[in-house]
Every structure is written in structure tokens, then in C-alpha cells.
Amino acid sequence: MACSKMSVDLECCICLEEDIERVDTIPCQHTVCRPCYLKPMINKCPVCRVRWIARERDPLAKDYTGEHYAHTYGFFAVNIDEESEEEEEEQVIEEEPQTPEIDPEEIELPRRFVDERIEYFLATGLRIDYVLTRGYCPSIQADEQEVLYLPLYTIYCNAYDANDDILHGQEIEITIQITRGECGSGWCEAQFVYVSITDSEDSGPKPITHSVKGGIGAVRFSREEIEFELQTPLPIESRTSYSHFEWEITTPYFKINQTGEELYPWAVLDFYEEEFWEPIVEPLDGPVDVDMSSYSAIGGIASMLRVTAAARRDNDEQYNEIIGRHVSRKVLNGGAEKDYIYLREINGKEFSIYDKIGNCFVGTNKTGITLPFTHVPSPAAIRGNHHILKEPEYIYGEERDTSYETALQSFDDWELIKREELLQRRYKREEQNLKYTSNRLFYFEKEFEEIMEDKWAIESYMCEDDDNTKPEYTTDMRVACEQRDRHGTDIVKCRLDKEVGSRRMHTLIDGESGVGKSFLAGHLSRGLVFDLDWITPNEDGSKPELPEDLHYPIIILGKRFDYDMREITKRLLYKKEYVVVKLSYMYFFYCI
């Protein structure tokens, strides 16, 4: 009895009728004739006893079509080897000229990275909707004289800026040409081959063409994201009626995820060369506008802003200085040195005050508030939270006074934001950005109990005297600060009693500002702390070299050795580890 669907001579496995015209297949792959298939009392296969329900009786039952393809299958099985070999040869011949000759060890292209729309807020306050498409462009190598089909990425952007009518509604198209990179590094060189900006307002298209003067960078590809680092800025000049308006694409490095869940500014600290920065020390008769890009010099968090800084120098007491990786202004007033940065936005209507690491700072050098952030704070975001200067006459109109004494006086008199308002703003921001909880910036001072609440668990504190007496332990931060004041020392050391491996975690709390600012989050107690003051120096007393890979969740900058932050972040860039930066008057910690 031949009952299988794959048999050459089909017969019904129930009535044994041969030469069936209509064959229905049951789940066990045995064949039955149409009359037997529709009989209501028959629901088991007589061969293997498998139950089935006819599709006519149950519309949800699987429809097994009765195809009689035994002869076709046999013919295919006999000739399968010959046909497969012929198809493979034809496929290789057809695809060979279209396959890009890219070494997979040098570059790994992202997959399915086409038509991904991602909403992104740049540090300049522009809203960008990215649409990336990928193609291939032939490139001739000078040494090998061969044509390589290198990836060509085109980025379509829609730029919106509520504060600048010129940028409103413009479409930006950027094309990047990828060239070869170092083997195994994952990075390859790239250059801008095409940049165009078109005004697409509803009132009618107004084509605006721009010329690209330069732009060479590096691109790193992975299967899920594309990262681009711009090594030189792209000055773009308008050739239309907007000839007076010049601007730069100052996004040096961006990271795009396929799903669009993570998109934030990122920067490598050492891609700018020193020759791009020159100090401004020449005497000036009045305010002068200086174009610069201010970004963070710590932790790889970029804050690339197109800003205008007012510079003025009177009797060698005030000067504007641009140093290496950051922009700083030192004001000497009565022997007291204050280090602030006054940056004016591109529209020239408002000031923004930044500290040296690119975070908005409000207050004096002893007290202040640093806003937590998920993305790098933009001028538009900062302007929405609070205003820096108190009196508007300092920033509007021709009577604007840009002297630093007046600005600092207004700045010192400015009342700080109330603690309840700051907490409410922080909690609201945390609720809206739960997935970025590890990318926070926190600031604590002596009276921080109401900020801490139940979120932060302080383990223990201890205070040491100058004469190295036995330290007193306490779990109350206020008591620890009182002990510090009583003993007359400016250094309070905190120690977690939890031992991890063969080390104990030590955290240095700075109290030199007189306020007793401190930090120690309980959720960081699961890792080790790398305190630079605890490193064993060399025999000659010099600072030791840092290890190649720092696998410590917390890095603390001490006063014993002067380490450049770039030396540390180089080893932690692309790693989900915490970095703690100790300044003279406040502490920050954030996630790279």
C-alpha cells in the first residue's frame, strides 16, 4: 500500500482507491481522497493514527494542498548537483563586477541602514531629521591603479531653528566618501564630497547653493551604528542674497543607532590640532566678535557650539585666552582670579555662561548649580530653563555693556535657582529619559540631604586630623563636615566598608571651597575606585604611567599627580564605565 504523498502511485489510505484525481493532504503527510477527507466521522489517519480536522469543518485548520509532485521531485533530486553548480557559476559571473572590493578586516559596513529617520537635537539647537542612504562610488588608488567601489553615505537633514529665520526649513544634504583605513582598527578615513543646502519653506522653494572648502574626518562602522568624526570644520558660504551669513557645520562626531534609541554627541579629545587655536592678547578698543567652537575637554562629551565671544582688554587686567582643548576667560579683579566663560549665541541677543568643561554653570566659584543632562546642553535648552544675566540692558541694544566687571557684578548678584525647582526639573527629566539614567551629571554640596532622599545610600564617612589621629567614623554627612571644621582640615576622606577583591574603595572628598562639597553614590559601591593620589610614584618621585586599559568604574583626579584627562579618557572611550572628575570647587561624575 502506497499512502505517502511522495509516492509515485498515489492511493487513498482510507478507501485504498487508486488513481485519485483530487488528493487532500492531512498533517501526517499521508494522502486521502476527497470523499474520505470530508467524511465527518473520519478524523484519524489509519496509518499513523494522527488526528486532523477538515478545513471545511474548521476554517482555522491548516490548508494542506494535495500536490502530486513525486515525479517532479524525483527529477529534481537526480539533477540537483548539476543545476546547483551551473547556477553558482552564473551567479558569480553576474555579481563579480558589482561587488565592492573592500577588505572586511578594515571596515565593517552596517546592515539595513537605509531610510532610517532619527530625530536629533544638535548642540546648536537645530533639530535634525536624518535619512541615510548608502551607495558606492568608484575611487582610483594612486599606488595600485585600480578602481575600488567605496561606500558613499548621503545624509539628508532638515534643519529647524526657532531663533534663526535663515536656518528655518532648510534641507541639508551631506555626502561622505569613505577611503581606506588602518587594518584592524575599525576606523577609516572619510571626506566630504558634496554638501548642499536648499530652502524648502512653504512660501516656495528658494534654492541656496553652497561651496565646500574642506572637511576630512574618520568614520567607524559596525553592524548597528555609524560614527563620524570631523577633523576639520566645514565652512560653508552662501552664494545668494544671504552672502553676509556664514556658518560652519560644527558637529565633529556623531553616533547613530539603527533603532534610533541612542543618538548623542560624542567626541574624541585629541582630533583638534594646536595650530587651530591662537591666544587673543592684543589690545582692543571695544568689543569684538571672535568665532570659536567650545566643547567639553573631559570625558569625551562634546559641546560643539557656534558661538560668539566678546573680548576686551583694559590695562592688562582682562583678557580672553583660548587654550588647547577648551576656551577660558580669566578675570583679575582685586587679586581674585575667576574663571568663567561668557559666550554669546549666534543671534547676538543673549549670553550663555559655561565653565571649562562645557556645562552650564550658575553661581560663583564657591557655590553653584550644574544642570544634569542627557544630551549636551544646547543654548536653546539652557535658555528654556533659566536666564543667566539678571538685567536685560546688558545684553540688548547698542547700550549693551560687555565689560567683565559689570557682567560679573550682575552675575554675582543673581539669585540661585531654588532647590525645589531644581529637584522638580531633575525628576521630570529623569522620567522623560529613563533609558539614559547612566548618562547623568550630578552635583552635591554640604546641604544635600533633600536631594539625596532615598535614591542615594551613603555608606560611611570619616574625618582625619592634621596630626594623623585615629579617624572618627560617622554615617551622617553633616556630622562629618562639623568634625572637619572642628579639626581645621580641608580634606574629608570617605571610605566604603564593603571590600571588593583585595582593595578597598577610597574616595577623596574636597572641602577646600569651605562649603564641604562631597559626593558618594551608593549604586557605585559595586565597583572599584581608581584614585590617582593612591598610585605608587616612580623611584624618582615622578608620576607613573597609566595602564593601557583602566577597568575601574570610578576615576578620581587627585592633587598629587597632574594627569591630563585625555590620557584617561583615551583608555575609557567606547567603554561603559564611570569617570569622576575632581575640580577645585565641585565634583562631577558621569558615564562614558
UniProtKB/Swiss-Prot annotation:
Name of the protein: Putative RING finger protein ORF9
Stored SMART domains: RING (SM00184)
Disulfide bonds: none
GO molecular function, one term: zinc ion binding
Pfam families associated with the record: zf-C3HC4
ZnF bounds (RING-type): 12-49
Keyword field contains Zinc: yes
Keywords of this entry: Coiled coil, Metal-binding, Zinc, Zinc-finger
InterPro entries referenced in this protein's UniProt entry, alphabetically: Znf_C3HC4_RING-type, Znf_RING, Znf_RING/FYVE/PHD, Znf_RING_CS
Coiled coil spans: 414-441
